[in-house]
C-alpha cells in the first residue's frame, strides 16, 4: 500500500495545471522566442524535480518496507544450527597488536558468535593444535558453559595444523543432526598451518567462514634454532653454539641484544640487526667448566611476540666413558690399550672392558658408550645382533679391519647389520704404501695439528682392505692409492669409524707414530659426543624416549618438567628392551629423567620452528583450496553472520538514498534566479 504514495507527485502535476487558449501577438514574436527558450529550461527543471520527488518517495517507502536480499545459504535460517568454533591457539596467536594479543581478539570474536545462538542450537569447540582430546567432541547446549570453556582454553606451543583441524570439525558437523551446519575458523591465517593440497568438499556442504585476526605491522625477531657446532666436548674446552635468528615481522630490522645463558649464568652476548624477511646465523663461543648434562638457553629482547624470544638447548659432556674392546690378545691389541691409557687424564676418563671374541657373550654391551672391534675374525650371531641393536640406539663403534678378518663372514653378517659397504678385496701384500690425503677440516683432527698445514710422519702399510664406495662414506684419511684408510659412516641412529688396516706391527707402523694416540682419543670423544647428544632437542608435543639399562628398572623414575612439576613414570617392556615414553611435553623448556635422583637424560623442548614463520596465507588460495568465506571485518562478525543466515537488509541504504534525493530536490528547487514568475507560470501552463 505504501507504494501508492509514489503516484502523488504525478497526480498533483496533472490536476493542478490550467489550460488556456493561446492568442498570438505578432509584434512580440521575437521576444516570445526568447521567452520560450527560458520556459523550456524551466520545464526541464520541473521534470527533474518531479523525477527526484518520485524517486525520493519510492526509496523512502521501500526503506520502511525493509527489503531483504537472501543468500543461497539462508534458506534454513530459522532452523536449528550446529556450529564448530575452530580456535587457533598456537604460539603465533600471542602476537600483540596495540596492547591486545590476537588470541584475545579471537576469543572476543568467538563470544560475539555465541551471542547469536538460539535455544536448540549446539556448539563445538576445537583447536588447531590438538583435535584428539575427548572433551572437544561433545556438543555444548549451555552457551554460558561454552563461553567459560572458550575463555579457559590456553595457548598451546605445539605446531598448528589448520587443515587437520578443519577435517576434524567437518567430521563433527557431519554427525550433527541440525539443519544448519557452520564452521568458524578464528586464526591469524599462518601459511604454514595450511596443507599444500586442497581440502575435499563435503556432500553435506557446511558453511565455512574464515575470521582472520591479523596484526598490521608487527615488529618481531625470533630465535628459530640453536645448534651445537662442536663435535668433541670436553671439560675446560671451548664450545661453539650456532644460533639462527629470523626477522619474521613486517618492519625493518632494529638492533637487538642476543644473550646466551648456561645454567642461568650469562656466558656470551651479541648485538644483531636483521632486515625484514631475512635470517642469520650467529656463532657464540664459551668455555664449559663442568661435565655431565649442560643446560642453556638463548634469549632475545622483548618485541611483539614474546614466545619466540627464548630457545632452550642441552648437551652432554662425558664424565667417564665405558669402552668395550673386542679382539685377540696380540701385539696390536696391547699397543691399542697402551695408547688409550697413555695419560692420567685418559685413564680416569676411559674405562676399558677388554674381551676376546670367544668370550664376547659376557660383555655388557648395553652399559657401554663405545665399542671397538680390532681385527676380529668372527663373532657369534647373537653378539652381532646385540651389537646392531645397541648401535641403532646411538652406540658408537670403531671398527678395525685386518688380516684376521674373515672377509666372507664380514660381508655376509657384520656389514649388513651395521649398514656398511662390503670388502671387495685385500691389497698391498708384498709391497709398501703410505697415507695420502687428509681431511683436516673434520672435527677428529681438531687440536691435533698446529696451524693450517698438516704435517706428520706418515706411517707405512703392507696390507689393507679395499671397501666398496657408498654415498654415506666420508674419508678422513686415505692411502696414497686413493683407497680410504679411515672413513666415517654417520646416520641418525649412530656413527661408525672404520680403519681398513689393523694396528699390528707386521701390517703397519701406525701404532708407533705420534698421531696414533691423539687420533684414537679424538675418535672416541667424537663418537661419544654424537651418541650422547642424539635426539636431545624436540618440539613441543613430541614424545620423550629413553631406553633403560637393567640396573635402572628397580629405581624410582621421574620426569622433571620446566614448570617445576614432577611426573612419576613407569617403563614399558618391549622386545627391544625397557623404554620410557613420556608425551606430556606441551611446555617449552628443559625436561630431565631421573632415577633415584640421578639424572639419566635431559631434553630441550621448544616451539616448532615452522610455528615461528609468521607469513600469512594468500586469501585467494585459502578460499579456493579450503572452501572458506572470508570475513573482512572480524569486529562485525555478528552482523556478517546475521546477514548470511537471514539475508542482507537494505533499509538503511534506501532511507539514506531517499533523504539525499530530497536534499537534492530542495537545492534544485531553490536555485537562485530559476524560480519562474507568475506570468511565466501562466505561460507554461498555457503552453502545456
Indicate residue ranges for each PLM-predicted region.
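Juxtamembrane linker/hinge segments adjacent to transmembrane helices in membrane proteins
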Residues: 1-62, 629-644, 670-688
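Enriched for extracellular/lumenal, surface-exposed ectodomains of secreted and cell-surface proteins
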Residues: 186-187, 295-307, 503
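Von Willebrand factor
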Residues: 76-137, 147-149, 164-172, 180-187, ...
Amino acid at each position: 500500500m505504501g507504494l501508492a504514495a509514489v503516484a502523488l507527485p504525478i497526480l498533483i502535476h496533472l490536476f493542478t495545471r490550467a489550460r488556456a487558449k493561446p492568442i498570438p501577438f505578432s509584434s512580440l514574436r521575437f521576444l516570445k522566442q526568447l521567452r520560450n527558450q527560458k520556459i523550456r529550461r524551466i520545464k526541464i527543471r520541473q521534470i527533474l524535480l518531479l523525477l527526484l520527488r518520485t524517486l525520493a518517495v519510492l526509496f523512502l517507502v521501500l526503506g520502511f518496507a525493509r527489503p531483504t536480499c537472501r543468500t543461497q545459504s539462508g534458506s534454513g535460517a530459522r532452523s536449528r544450527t550446529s556450529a564448530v568454533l575452530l580456535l587457533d591457539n598456537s604460539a603465533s596467536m600471542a602476537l600483540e597488536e596495540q596492547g591486545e594479543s590476537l588470541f584475545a581478539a579471537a576469543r572476543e570474536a568467538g563470544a560475539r558468535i555465541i551471542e547469536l545462538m538460539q535455544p536448540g542450537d549446539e556448539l563445538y569447540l576445537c583447536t588447531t593444535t590438538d583435535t584428539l582430546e575427548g572433551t572437544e567432541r561433545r556438543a555444548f547446549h549451555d552457551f554460558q558453559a561454552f563461553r567459560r570453556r572458550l575463555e579457559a582454553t590456553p595457548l598451546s606451543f605445539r605446531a598448528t595444523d589448520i587443515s587437520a583441524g578443519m577435517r576434524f570439525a567437518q567430521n563433527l558437523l557431519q554427525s550433527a543432526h541440525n539443519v544448519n551446519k557452520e564452521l568458524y575458523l578464528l586464526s591469524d591465517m599462518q601459511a604454514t598451518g595450511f596443507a599444500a593440497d586442497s581440502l575435499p568438499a563435503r556432500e553435506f556442504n557446511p558453511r565455512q567462514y574464515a575470521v582472520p585476526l591479523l596484526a598490521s605491522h608487527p615488529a618481531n625477531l625470533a630465535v628459530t634454532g640453536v645448534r651445537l657446532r662442536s663435535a668433541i666436548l670436553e671439560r675446560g674446552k671451548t664450545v661453539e653454539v650456532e644460533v639462527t635468528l629470523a626477522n619474521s615481522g613486517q618492519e625493518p630490522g632494529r638492533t637487538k641484544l642476543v644473550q646466551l645463558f648456561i645454567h642461568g649464568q650469562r656466558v656470551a652476548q651479541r648485538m644483531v640487526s636483521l632486515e625484514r624477511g631475512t635470517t642469520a646465523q650467529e656463532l657464540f663461543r664459551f668455555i664449559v667448566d663442568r661435565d655431565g648434562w649442560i643446560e642453556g638457553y638463548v634469549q632475545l629482547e622483548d618485541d611483539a611476540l614474546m614466545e619466540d624470544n627464548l630457545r632452550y638447548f642441552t648437551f652432554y659432556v662425558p664424565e667417564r666413558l665405558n669402552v668395550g674392546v673386542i679382539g685377540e690378545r696380540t701385539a696390536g691389541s696391547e699397543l691399542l690399550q697402551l695408547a688409550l691409557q697413555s695419560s692420567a687424564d685418559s685413564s680416569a676418563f676411559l674405562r676399558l672392558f677388554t674381551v676376546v671374541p670367544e668370550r664376547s657373550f659376557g660383555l655388557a654391551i648395553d652399559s657401554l658408550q663405545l665399542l671397538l672391534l680390532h681385527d676380529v675374525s668372527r663373532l657369534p650371531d647373537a653378539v652381532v645382533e646385540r651389537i646392531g641393536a645397541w648401535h641403532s640406539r646411538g652406540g658408537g663403534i670403531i671398527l678395525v679391519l685386518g688380516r684376521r678378518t674373515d672377509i666372507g663372514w664380514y660381508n655376509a653378517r657384520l656389514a649388513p647389520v651395521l649398514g656398511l659397504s662390503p670388502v671387495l678385496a685385500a691389497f698391498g701384500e708384498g709391497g709398501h704404501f703410505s697415507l695420502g690425503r687428509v681431511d683436516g677440516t673434520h672435527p677428529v683432527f681438531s687440536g691435533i695439528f698446529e696451524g693450517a698445514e698438516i704435517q706428520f710422519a706418515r706411517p707405512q702399510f703392507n696390507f689393507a682392505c679395499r671397501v666398496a664406495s657408498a654415498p654415506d662414506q666420508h674419508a678422513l684419511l686415505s692411502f696414497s692409492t686413493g683407497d680410504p684408510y679411515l672413513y666415517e659412516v654417520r646416520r641418525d641412529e649412530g656413527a661408525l669409524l672404520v680403519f681398513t688396516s689393523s694396528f699390528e706391527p707386521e701390517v703397519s707402523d701406525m701404532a708407533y707414530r705420534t698421531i696414533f694416540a691423539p687420533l684414537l682419543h679424538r675418535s672416541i670423544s667424537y663418537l661419544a659426543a654424537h651418541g650422547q647428544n642424539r635426539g636431545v632437542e624436540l618440539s613441543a608435543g613430541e614424545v620423550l624416549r629413553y631406553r633403560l639399562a637393567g640396573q635402572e628398572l628397580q629405581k624410582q623414575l621421574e620426569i622433571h618438567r620446566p614448570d617445576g612439576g614432577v611426573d612419576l613414570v613407569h617403563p614399558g617392556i618391549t622386545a627391544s628392551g625397557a623404554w620410557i615414553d613420556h608425551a606430556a611435553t606441551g611446555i617449552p623448556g628443559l625436561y630431565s629423567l631421573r632415577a633415584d635422583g640421578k639424572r639419566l637424560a635431559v631434553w630441550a623442548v621448544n616451539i616448532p620452528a615452522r610455528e615461528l614463520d609468521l607469513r600469512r596465507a594468500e586469501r585467494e588460495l585459502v578460499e579456493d583450496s579450503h572452501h572458506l568465506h572470508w570475513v573482512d571485518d572480524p569486529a562485525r562478525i555478528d552482523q556478517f553472520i546475521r546477514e548470511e543466515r537471514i539475508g542482507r537488509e537494505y533499509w538503511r541504504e534506501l532511507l539514506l538514498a531517499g533523504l539525499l534525493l530530497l536534499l537534492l530536490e530542495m537545492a534544485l528547487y531553490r536555485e537562485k534566479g530559476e524560480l519562474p514568475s507568475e506570468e511565466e507560470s501562466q505561460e507554461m501552463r498555457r503552453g502545456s
